[in-house]
């Protein structure tokens, strides 16, 4: 059995030296003839190996691998190394790793080889790292570079050393490894080496890595490390945004909101910011401003997203509330505080009337909600229905959600009207009201008032979850969808992780937190 050249190169570095046990055996038999001494020492090693001596098992594996003292046999070598490794012998584990790396005695498996090398290093095999450093220096081995990169990055057998990490990242990056190209580019960007960062982001972007596409666009848009080109930069960031990358969605939304490098377009800004807002505080903040300052203000959604972004934007909120041009928003929040925290419905209605006069349809919606509240001593559901209808005419989508509940129960109505209730619920869900999406999803899930449709239910639940407002029943039903692998779900590959997240899911309470933080 012949060994290939790469195996010979590796063996010269990786195999453990003859054990001290063998040297001692030879010494002990030094008075006997040389041939007999060698034969006896081999038999002693075999005997010890058969009795379970891990060092002897490793040594016997070395002999079978190299053909020294025995007939060469990779598979038998691996069997002995496996026995040694089972007893946590670091040399045996390291030699097993070599077999998996080269495919000698077993099917080649780089992942298993990498795992075994790291295990051997952790258990004290100090020779592996310098051996692989020499291999990289001599041949530029991609496998060895990856092993060393991981070791220096995570402190496996060595102290963490980010400079060395970058050295081995570059070896991998030059070989065409897209993840290494991206990681190296990010490292360069963080250390203000924008030109080199741009080079490697571009290489990774060519291979379709969405994060690299985003960063390449970001650098072009801002002229970092490359000549500034806002149009091309925005096009690349948009490409990444369409691949559901929140950072890209935020930057594209911001550009449209501010008219930076492109014509100002609030509708497009809302689209991109809305896709990112559930995961990106800056996107949530800007989305709130879009709803607040749009041609037709939507105070319901503006408040929802501004409250989501409140932590980290305290100064921005204080500045917003101090702005005399934002009196409508100020009064709306003050009214919500009276409604939710103080249960002072009379004071709340007064503030919501002020909001109405300033052009906010949600002021009418919240007047109705205050009048319909079960704790309001002056409760008037008929008047509430009338106000909800008026609010809808003024453009309040939230009013459709509240009014649908009244049609469903018949409160304030002459009779129950489930058909109209469903119509209004759909209107609210399509308008971005998360709790309407939850409720409509529950209906599709249960087949209540609509034909049962798990796919439609899952779509609605995902929309509500993106706003951090999934109800407990919706979360439970979404778990059911993941357990059964419905294709509409975008991340089925991570179904187990998603199920665990959903089991612990708690809807956002950001609005109440914001209201509690407001000064009188």
Predicted regions and their residues:
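N-terminal leader/linker segments that initiate helical-solenoid repeat arrays
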Residues: 21-62, 121, 322, 326-330, ...
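Hydrophobic face of amphipathic alpha-helices that form TPR/SEL1-like repeat modules
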Residues: 59-66, 95-102, 131-135, 147-154, ...
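Terminal, low-structured helical/coil segments at or just beyond the last alpha-helical repeat
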Residues: 29, 318-326, 330, 489-520
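Short helix-capping/linker turns of helical repeat alpha-solenoids
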Residues: 50-53, 66-68, 73, 86-90, ...
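Bacterial N-terminal signal peptides
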Residues: 8-17
